[in-house]
A protein has these predicted regions:
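Short amphipathic alpha-helix used as the core "switch/output" element in two-component signaling
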Residues: 42, 65-78
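C-terminal output helix
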Residues: 108-119
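Two-component/phosphorelay signaling modules centered on CheY-like receiver
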Residues: 12-32
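Alpha4 helix (beta4-alpha4-beta5 surface) of REC/receiver domains from two-component response regulators
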Residues: 66, 88-102, 115
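Helix N-cap/capping motif at the beta->alpha junctions
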Residues: 33-42, 64
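Hydrophobic/aromatic residues positioned on beta-strands within the core alpha/beta folds
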Residues: 83-86
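Active-site residues of response regulator receiver
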Residues: 56
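Receiver (REC) domain active-site loop signature in two-component systems and cognate sites
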Residues: 59
Length: 122
């Protein structure tokens, strides 16, 4: 199955690190990126073929929590898994309450990321 992943993080280096891990995964065929939740919402409207979102919480403009609220308010997005990647474990409950499917602590390990991708896209 071809898979398109959207990486949402305001930190350029974090986006590139995640992309490097994703490029090594044979399931991932395309990678899109967004600097904040607003950019991510725009990309999702323009490209409904995205299969998975990897989302940071702390971002300018529209943060990860606000993105989740807006994104999940549209029921047509219910089938798209969102995995939150964050250094802040204290916000786990908040991200799940707002529609995240899963949570990975940064720095993300390749095996953990691949496990979650398999879990949510199989």
């Amino acid at each position: 199955m071809a898979m398109k992943v959207l990486v949402v993080d305001d930190d350029f280096i974090n986006r590139k690190l995640i992309q490097t891990l994703l490029k090594k995964n044979p399931k991932v065929t395309e990678i899109e990126e967004a600097e904040n939740g607003s950019d991510a919402l725009d990309k999702m409207k323009k490209d409904p073929s995205i299969n998975l979102i990897l989302l940071d919480i702390m971002m300018p403009v529209v943060d990860g929590i606000e993105f989740l609220k807006i994104f999940r308010s549209d029921m047509s997005n219910a089938h798209i898994p969102v995995i939150v990647l964050s250094t802040d474990d204290t916000r786990k409950t908040e991200v799940f309450d707002n529609g995240a499917n899963d949570f990975l602590r940064k720095p993300v390990m390749q095996n953990d990321l691949y496990e979650k991708i398999d879990q949510w896209t199989s």
